[in-house]
Curated annotation (Swiss-Prot):
Subcellular location: Cytoplasm
Gene3D superfamilies hit by this protein: Aldolase class I
GN (gene name): kdsA
NCBIfam families in UniProt: KDO8P_synth, PRK05198.1, PRK12457.1
Entry protein name: 2-dehydro-3-deoxyphosphooctonate aldolase
UniProt keyword Transferase, yes or no: yes
Biological processes per GO annotation: keto-3-deoxy-D-manno-octulosonic acid biosynthetic process
Superkingdom of source: Bacteria
Keyword Cytoplasm annotated: yes
GO cellular component, one term: cytoplasm
Catalytic activity: D-arabinose 5-phosphate + phosphoenolpyruvate + H2O = 3-deoxy-alpha-D-manno-2-octulosonate-8-phosphate + phosphate
Species annotation: Mannheimia succiniciproducens (strain KCTC 0769BP / MBEL55E)
Assigned keywords, A-Z: Cytoplasm, Lipopolysaccharide biosynthesis, Transferase
E.C. designation(s): 2.5.1.55
Family to which the UniProt record says this protein belongs: Belongs to the KdsA family.
Amino acid sequence: MQNKIVRIGDINVANDNPFVLFGGMNVLESRDMAMQVCEKYVEVTNKLGVPYVFKASFDKANRSSIHSYRGPGMEEGLKIFQELKQTFGVKIITDVHEIYQCKPVAEVADVIQLPAFLARQTDLVEAMARTGAVINVKKPQFLSPGQMGNIVEKIEECGNDKVILCDRGSNFGYDNLVVDMLGFGVMKKVSKGAPVIFDVTHSLQCRDPFGAASGGRRDQVTELARAGLAVGIAGLFLEAHPDPNNAKCDGPSALPLSVLEGFVSQMKALDDLVKSFPQLDTSK
């Protein structure tokens, strides 16, 4: 199977290319924090030679509680993204939740993301596809990897073949997620070689069954990320925060920003090693 290349500006995303880091913060908490987080990612990825795309949400539309922080909204969020692009020269990935958001967001962001909970909403999928933007599809927690081929087909039927697939874990009973490492290969197969990336921090979520916010297992982020990259994938999707214990969303799953360089350094070493191996055909 030939691996497809999806281009994000000058970044070539493919399963057999050096991994791309899609990293940032969960939600835009403030303009100043976004600048701080982006600056650190740029510093680390430039130093280590890792291709980089900044990620954050302008609206967390699927929060569990009506009282939870959602973000600054689309208009203010796009202004922050524009400033980040102008200041640091980064590419941007962010998610959309409504059809009306697709066009204006695609005019600023380099990649628009289809949220896991909305990945089967055909009208939204078609609206995103028709922008012509690169689309990152989050695999729903309730969907098997093989079913991702149907979502890819919807996008391609609209004339857009710039698709990236992302695993963020699968439901394992109530309020828990696990990652099936065989699923990455299945998604590659059903998409005919599309780039597949791994959202390691969201995969560490562990809900309180009676609470209004997600817990997490950030103490295991390194081992889970290593496992994902060992399969041979196109990229890693990561959230970091200067103060995870006081983050406004998903702090328990976020990597402390202070250890970002050590983390990315390990991931690059592992990715380089895995992709130095010759491909073996074990299907015969």
